[in-house]
């Protein structure tokens, strides 16, 4: 069998046999490499697998385009790691560690802001409750003041007006000690007069319920965060609880006027709790260090509105019954009895 290869421009035709290899100075034709590749292909297939991947006790090495590849066996399938990839991963781990440190520092700054806000809030709430207790103990003869003066119920609007001012001004609202004490005195006096008209068990119950609601909704604000699904679940649970409470209140044997007062107070408390949750989210995520007083005042106004509404809901039915001529409890003094004795 003869193989004829054609030389290019300056080459001549040469003939050779399969037994004697061709020797010519001409460059090989384009068909020659193809023929050679076809001949060498079976030889390459018959060669033993010369794969560069050679495993030695769970570690296999193979050439990389630039550097060597390293295979490491981990929990089943081996993971392919190049030297450059290893270096990149180490750099990413270092960056991740640095980022976590920065996040920790940022979280610590937020934590200090939270401490400032809630410390100011606790001071305001303690001052208001303490002043109210002093008024309640110092003026027992005015225990029936709210029964004779229905117009005093309008003082419940004091924290609502303060809330309207703070939300209207927004970030332009001043955040200093002067503003803090103005809001503190205005709401503390209102709460103190309201407490004079209430019984001791009603006061203690209002204190406990206000603190419990504040702690609960602050915890829900941390739990819900910015997740809408969680807030939907929280809202559904709260609506079910509210409807259950209203059903029990409406099915009771109380007067229809008392039922109306309880229903209105329940909806008002729900509204204030929603504002409290919103203010708590603002403190958690969007409170700068120079606005701590303003955010603490917002939380304080929300809590005072809830407290006064609870007092009105728990003491309102009794005030209504007293105004209709119902007998007073033992040990309760009224303005009329005091005037008659004098």
From Swiss-Prot:
It is a multi-pass membrane protein. The keyword Transmembrane helix applies. GO terms for cellular component: membrane. InterPro entries: Bax_inhibitor_1-related (IPR006214). Residues 36-48 have a biased composition (Basic residues). Residues 21-64 are annotated as: Disordered. The keyword Transmembrane applies. Glycans are attached at residues 149, 176, 330. Disulfide bonds: none annotated. Belongs to the cytomegalovirus US12 family. This is Transmembrane protein HWLF3.
């Amino acid at each position: 069998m003869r193989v004829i290869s054609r030389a290019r421009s300056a080459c001549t035709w040469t003939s050779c046999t399969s037994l004697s290899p061709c020797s010519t100075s001409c460059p090989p034709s384009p068909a020659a490499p193809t023929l050679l590749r076809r001949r060498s292909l079976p030889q390459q297939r018959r060669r033993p697998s010369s794969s560069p991947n050679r495993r030695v006790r769970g570690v296999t090495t193979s050439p990389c385009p630039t550097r060597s590849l390293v295979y490491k066996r981990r929990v089943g399938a081996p993971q392919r790691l190049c030297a450059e990839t290893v270096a990149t991963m180490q750099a990413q781990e270092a960056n991740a560690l640095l980022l976590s440190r920065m996040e920790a520092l940022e979280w610590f700054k937020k934590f200090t802001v939270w401490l400032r806000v809630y410390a100011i809030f606790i001071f305001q709430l303690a001052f208001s409750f303490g002043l109210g207790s002093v008024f309640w103990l110092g003026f027992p003869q005015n225990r029936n003041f709210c029964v004779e003066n229905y117009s005093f119920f309008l003082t419940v609007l004091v924290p609502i007006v303060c809330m309207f001012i703070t939300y209207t001004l927004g970030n332009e609202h001043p955040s200093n000690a002067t503003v803090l004490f103005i809001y503190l005195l205005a709401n503390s006096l209102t709460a103190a007069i309201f407490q004079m008209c209430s019984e001791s068990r009603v006061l203690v119950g209002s204190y406990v319920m206000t603190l419990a609601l504040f702690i609960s909704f602050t915890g829900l604000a941390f739990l819900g965060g910015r997740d809408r699904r969680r807030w939907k679940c929280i809202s559904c649970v709260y609506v079910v609880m509210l409807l259950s409470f209203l059903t029990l209140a409406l099915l009771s044997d109380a007067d229809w006027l008392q039922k109306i007062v309880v229903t209105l107070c329940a909806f008002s408390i729900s509204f204030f709790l929603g504002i409290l949750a919103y203010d708590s989210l603002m403190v958690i995520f969007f409170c700068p260090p120079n606005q701590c007083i303003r955010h603490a005042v917002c939380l304080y106004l929300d809590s005072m509105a809830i407290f006064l509404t609870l007092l009105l809901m728990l003491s309102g039915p009794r005030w209504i019954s007293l105004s209709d001529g119902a007998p007073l409890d033992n040990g309760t003094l009224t303005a009329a009895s005091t005037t008659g004795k004098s």
